[in-house]
A protein has these predicted regions:
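Trp/Phe/Arg-rich N-terminal binding region typifying the photolyase-homology
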Residues: 2-214, 218, 317, 388, ...
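Residues in well-ordered beta-strands of folded domains
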Residues: 58, 175, 200, 264, ...
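Alpha-helical packing segments of well-folded alpha/beta enzyme cores
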Residues: 70, 109, 113, 259-266, ...
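Active-site-proximal binding-pocket segments
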Residues: 280-481
């Protein structure tokens, strides 16, 4: 693959420039060499029945219109069979520990998706309920000829897909597309990988084939045969059963256009410092794109295509960003796809489980309840500041996420409590919670996955250790603590209180 030439960013026409790139690639998905290995046919049939009334794409992980392989594949089927194209999204009554913060970000972006679909003569349906019920109803009611679904390796959405596989009409193909990873998860590797070093080569050898420009999703030439219900966006969240005390954050604008604004900001302002300053929580050097990645509002592949055009100016920064955004991110999907215990201590390697068990009864110098952790009530002002950042902004600097999770292991009664509480707090407050990257981050910090055994010590065993003094050597801790009001709560602990009878 030839290296892109040096480029100067032109922010005024970024959206138009991307549209032109797609048009220059192909006139539509029908004229594009779509890689069939991106798709898994989950049903016994793979042909669209002649009496079908449309093609349906159930959007879940990939919440965008353009640069979406799932949507493009659905349009390919619809164009080939001369059928209307429909897309639906299901507003769940509850999803793990998602809060109003996440649901508002989602719904505002879906309104943008709906408007974009309208411009392209594609029918958008906002459904309420669990997908294995309401998507199936839509397929049956309107005689959809095929159902296209996103790949998402987490347990709950995978269960919905399995239910649909078992209940969808026998003559309706069910196709799953990995539009999230550059190299589809099942293509990158057919097994659970030990770490980045074992999957890196497998992905990099396949990148030249998969890291291509996208064709456009075009205005659809076939009209829907039935009227689409009007969407009441103001009341879209009226009946969801979520925590409404955790409200939206202001720094990230929902949707594809909001994502492009953040990408533009990263390329023009922060990319040059990514290599040297990305591990310093007091510096503004990260992409900040993880909320949009998680909700699928921008394609990681699109971001890589744009960022790598600046490799001549910022070689090390671009290379490191690609390592984090491709290798590390796709390693997380690999872990969750091939390890059913991706959010449990049981999912750790044997050496880590043995080591944690050997130190299970070690005395903890400090111990906290989940509520105390959630409310930043520890003796550690840096930890409290990091927790405050996550609660207020819906994000935490990557370096501090490691320190934050490891201290939870140090200050809780058991590894099981530590992992459960870290996942709960991350899922509740982080804009990118409930994501393979989040689970893997907690599992790396607490259970040593994708890592090796280190010098043995109390509580941690052979799990990699991090401490306050190490952070002081890395960055200006006092500055970060001041910014996020990290107050010390002097609380010398007596572990015995955790086991007193009530």
């Amino acid at each position: 693959m030839s290296e892109p030439q040096k480029k100067k960013f032109k922010s005024s026409n970024f959206i138009d420039e991307l549209d032109q790139k797609r048009k220059n690639t192909a006139s539509s998905i029908l004229n594009f060499p779509f890689i069939k290995k991106r798709v898994k046919v989950l049903s016994a049939v793979d042909e669209v029945a002649k009496n079908s009334k449309g093609i349906l794409y159930w959007m879940f992980r990939e919440g965008r219109v353009q640069d979406n392989w799932s949507f493009l594949f659905a349009q390919k089927l619809a164009l080939k069979n001369k059928l209307p194209l429909h897309v639906c999204y299901c507003i769940l009554p509850k999803f793990l520990d998602a809060t109003l913060r996440h649901y508002k970000f989602l719904v505002e972006s879906l309104e943008e998706v709906s408007n974009d679909c309208k411009d392209l003569n594609i029918s958008f349906h906002l459904l309420h309920g669990t997908p294995n019920v309401v998507v199936l109803d839509l397929v049956k009611k309107h005689k959809m000829g095929a159902l296209v679904v996103d790949f998402f390796p987490l347990r709950v959405p995978s269960g919905w897909v399995e239910d649909l596989k078992n209940s969808i009409p026998k003559d309706v193909p069910l196709c799953q597309v990995d539009g999230h990873n550059l190299v589809p998860c099942w293509v990158a590797s057919d097994k659970l990988e030990y770490g980045a070093r074992t999957i890196r080569g497998k992905i990099n050898t396949k990148l030249p084939e998969y890291l291509t420009e996208f064709p456009p999703l075009i205005k659809h030439p076939h009209d829907s045969a039935f009227k689409i219900p009007t969407i009441d966006w103001k009341n879209a969240l009226k009946d969801v059963q979520i925590d409404r005390t955790v409200d939206k954050v202001d720094w990230c604008k929902p949707g594809y256009r909001g994502a492009l604004m953040e990408l533009e900001s990263f390329i023009t302002k922060r990319l040059k410092n990514y290599n040297t300053k990305r591990n310093d929580p007091t510096e503004d050097a990260l992409s900040k794109l993880s909320p949009w990645f998680h909700f699928g509002q921008i394609s990681v592949q699109r971001v890589i295509l744009e960022v790598r055009e600046y490799k001549k100016q910022h070689k090390e920064s671009v290379e490191n960003f690609m390592e984090e955004s491709i290798i590390r991110r796709e390693l997380s999907d690999n872990f969750c796809f091939y390890n059913k215990n991706y959010d449990s201590v049981e999912g750790a390697n044997a050496w880590a489980i043995e080591s944690l068990n050997q130190h299970r009864k070690d005395k903890r110098e400090y111990i906290y309840t989940r509520d105390e952790l959630e409310n930043s009530q520890t003796h550690d002002d840096l930890w409290n500041a990091a927790q405050n950042q996550m609660v207020r902004e819906g994000k935490m600097h990557g370096f501090l996420r490691m320190y934050w999770a490891k201290k939870i292991l140090e200050w809780t009664p058991s590894p099981e409590d530590a992992l459960a509480w870290a996942i709960y707090l991350n899922d509740k407050y982080s804009m990118d919670g409930r994501d393979p990257n989040g689970y893997v981050g907690c599992m790396w910090s607490i259970c040593g996955i994708h890592d090796q055994g280190w010098k043995e010590r109390s509580v941690f065993g052979k799990i990699r250790y991090m401490n306050y003094k190490g952070c002081e050597r890395k960055f200006d801790v006092k500055s970060f603590v001041r910014k996020y009001d990290g107050k010390v709560v002097n609380k010398k602990n007596d572990i015995s209180k955790m086991f007193k009878k009530k």
